[in-house]
Amino acid sequence: RFYTSSYEDLIIKNEIAEFRFAGNYTAYLPYSTNKEKPMAMAFQNTYEVKPLSEAPQELAFLPVTVDCKQAKVTLLESDLEAYPGMFVQPDGKQALKGVFAPYPKKTDFYPWRKQEYVTEAENYIARVKGNRTYPWRILAITEKDAEMPVNNLVYALASPNRIGDYSWVKPGKVGWDWWNDWNLKGVPFKAGINMDTYKYYIDFASRNGLEYVVLDEGWYDPKSGDMLIVIPELDLPELIRYGKSKGVELVLWTVFNVLDSQLDEACRK
């Protein structure tokens, strides 16, 4: 990682980060799904597997893995705060080049979900305090694939906990409504964003040892930008009670800036 020691705030014009490999190894790359604006997407995709020299020279997001035969190298970041996350772009040879989103100059909101997006960007990537550290760039080396999910370098290099007691945060497996778009077949009710559908999901999660069910977009009206008003088709307290009776907790999805603007009220409610 880099660090700077300055009494004045700084503007970071750009950063050069390149990862060059000794051979034309196979890369596992999750490419952006937005061809027009590749840095504006949901950071979720399947991995494309190609030799480095044949990999499309498009933006991919982290983590990226390169199979160096005797071991795999996974490129990661940690302690990423007030700085753009790194994308990588194959160079058509045997390297991956770091690419960084420019700093937003102007933003607007999508009217259908109150989600902020960039309309104009600056010609630099960050405005930062002069005395600070920058993200760790991690090369996690594993000899067996089973070692990847238990590698703790990201956690070990992160800043110490600043939120106090976090014992209420519990990991677990989830059932996700968007995975099949509420598209249930052969059920004695109309599938959709309603009580019957989510109770069906909760029953499935309970039978199969899933600790959580996610209520993704639609449990509040995204156009309103008000997560305190649940749609009339759902009785959220009753759904929470039903889930607890089955040993299943609920996770509520929301647009970040909606939660940020209503954080105190939402947590009290």
Name each model-derived stretch.
Residues 129-204, 208, 212:
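An acidic-aromatic substrate-binding cleft motif
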